[in-house]
């Protein structure tokens, strides 16, 4: 991994690395925050998945998470949201193609050549983190919007691998809303059964479980009713007896003003779980 940015932050280092991804067949950037104790001991890892139009920069520059990651001694890994490059398929819209990988493995041309974000986040990136950084095997996952969807899917499909999961404003029923339907039709085809592998509410209804889910949702979020539908997640978790910490916030929208307001509580939540044995 090639170091391309290095910034001192709260006694640690906010770095950005570039590497070639075998899963995605392109060069990828990834943000890695190394807290002060990373120089002396191995630490647990929180993976953060960003939302539509984002890259690795949004979370590391806008959330203020470094203060809390330093306090709780957690390495934070923030990858890009899709494969990148002039040779990678793209679309002339914000919710498909580059910047909109949806953390799935595409099966349809032209997307299936590079869009294997599920494999990248689940397999390749954790292997690289273990090879290059002082990380323990204990990891948690979180994200925002499309990234909240990805975090929930990865945790639900791999409950023994992630200690905890949380999300800000996640797309909880992508097979039922325009963002998900349009992306899934392009990436996965018209067989809607295939869509359900990447739909948190559907996965839970099929019996996939995690110990607990934490979600924060702003009630002034323009996408709340049409695209996100947080109450669907709350309802299915109640039906399936999955513990939740779902909080609704008056006045907060879909932006990083919202994420930055509560990211400290999410990192503390994950730190508590990661440090339990």
UniProtKB/Swiss-Prot annotation:
Q: What is its EC number?
A: 3.1.2.12
> What GO cellular component term, any one, is given?
cytosol
Q: Name one GO biological process term.
A: formaldehyde catabolic process
Q: Which reaction does it catalyse?
A: S-formylglutathione + H2O = formate + glutathione + H(+)
Recorded superkingdom: Bacteria
Listed A to Z, the keywords are: Hydrolase, Serine esterase
Is Cell membrane there in the keyword field?
no
Which residues does the entry assign to the active site, renumbered to this chain?
Answer: 145 (charge relay system), 221 (charge relay system), 254 (charge relay system)
Q: Which residues cross the membrane?
A: none
- Which one of the record's GO molecular function terms can you name? S-formylglutathione hydrolase activity
Q: What does this protein do?
A: Serine hydrolase involved in the detoxification of formaldehyde. Hydrolyzes S-formylglutathione to glutathione and formate.
Please identify the protein, giving its name as recorded. Answer: S-formylglutathione hydrolase FrmB
Task: Provide the species name.
Answer: Escherichia coli (strain SMS-3-5 / SECEC)
